């Protein structure tokens, strides 16, 4: 069996939560390796909905779950989400949940800064969740972050807070916002220290020991590769690296420990927030996909923008992430359409290209080139075998495989975990 990385190949919301939940039965350990509580997902287990945004999906199944060093942790949200799951009957104890001691913390001042920028102060509206993710990563890179381990060292914490506030209070003065008192921030952290410290661990050592014992690890990505800070639609991206390579740097496991990369893609495309979206359908088709697919954000409730499947973008992320197989989700949303379009290339300034350029200007000018396929009337919803699928749906899947350059390894035909068709087992490689 192998260690598997799960990564979104679009702009997030691809259905990673269900796929991770389905794969978790084959894994011993589930690891979150980037992002924060800005990207949520819903698990449906025995008819019960579990909404997660920070905690790893494996907790619902009682699996050892790790929040890696690549994640920014809001300690107050951690406490809230922990309580919510416990209230739903999920047993969460330190034996099955560990948090990297060197994971940076999201503080109230990060949320403040995020909200101020999104209000238009910065002159660029990205469409963030205003949860402080970006500012927390800025402090990490700026070498001034407060990390989980700092909560255990109260005697040195105040000095670190004062160093952090020298930066943030200067920003706040410039924006005309009241400065933060160091003692108030210290008290804020001490209020949650006892809640989070029992889960703290040197997680890279735990993972290394587990790997040497033959344990199988599932790396759970958040958001999607098209939101990657380097390879996404910059500047309309998130503040972390969301590509598969981040599984190593965000967990402390080396590249040699990764054996299979499973990309997740919807059978169409969605996006939340601002930024380019070549195949967006601002028409009846877009409305149909949004309503049928229940396309509203788990964290924010925002309506998602919807469009046709963009094979150019998915192929690009398949290449960058080293994807060996795709889990194709929400095929059932397309049931009943007379015809289905797939973007197979772009036109940019009169020339055909087969990739999305990096510049914002070029991204805004690309025009999608479509191929039109026949739709299907027979339902794919709740199909459990390949043989249950309509012929035209199979043709659609095969065409996508041809365009993106990799196989469909799993097929999801409803939000229920049981409605999954396994074609190639990622853990068997």
Swiss-Prot record:
Record-level GO cellular component terms: cytoplasm
Positions that bind GTP: 12-18, 40-42, 304, 330-332, 412-414
Cofactor list: Mg(2+)
Keyword Phosphoprotein in record: no
Active site residues per record: 13 (proton acceptor), 41 (proton donor)
Cofactor notes: Binds 1 Mg(2+) ion per subunit.
Family statement: Belongs to the adenylosuccinate synthetase family.
Cross-referenced NCBIfam families: PRK01117.1, purA
Protein name per its UniProtKB record: Adenylosuccinate synthetase
